[in-house]
Regions:
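Short, internal strand/loop/helix patches
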Residues: 80-82, 97-122
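N-proximal helix/coil linker or "cap" segments that precede and/or mark the start of modular domains
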Residues: 10-28
Length: 154
């Protein structure tokens, strides 16, 4: 998997935050991941929004939201949906999860490595919404309701 990440200004952050090593305000967030079709997805200077789902319930919530929106919403908003499947057994990933994701009309950037997952701020049962401007993190919020995600994508 192609993966490159640049996050700046980590100094003492790790000891002060339960998501040690996770992006924070002012950090530069540039990375390349693979999607459900094994195509490269770039979080770059043009990306405005990253929506991160760290588990099954948050992924289901994201799917529900995106099913109710036009399939081009993520692309139109310069948003990237990132799903963490690092905790999933490889057999389930290969035989069930990826084929199911491949049926979706939108792109899903996939994290398969737990170390990559730790680069994203997380709260239990919440979608992490990271706003970016020119590759820099300008806002991090955690949402649990469909309406909150839909609002972020407007």
């Amino acid at each position: 998997m192609v993966f490159a990440l640049f996050l700046s200004t980590f100094a003492s952050f790790a000891s002060a935050n339960p998501s040690a090593g996770a992006a924070r305000l002012g950090d530069t967030m540039l990375m390349e991941l693979k999607d459900q079709h094994d195509q490269t997805v770039a979080i770059n200077e043009q990306t405005n929004l990253v929506l991160f789902a760290a588990g099954k319930s948050t992924s289901a919530l994201m799917s529900k939201v995106l099913e109710d929106l036009p399939p081009t919403t993520l692309k139109d908003k310069k948003a990237i949906y990132v799903a963490d499947i690092s905790g999933m057994p490889s057999f389930i990933t290969k035989m069930v999860a990826i084929p199911k994701m491949q049926k979706r009309p939108y792109t899903i950037a996939i994290l398969r490595d737990e170390a990559q997952s730790k680069l994203f701020p997380q709260k239990d049962d919440a979608i992490t919404i990271i706003k970016l401007k020119s590759g820099k993190v300008t806002e991090i919020t955690f949402v649990t309701k469909q309406e909150e995600i839909t609002k972020a994508l407007q």
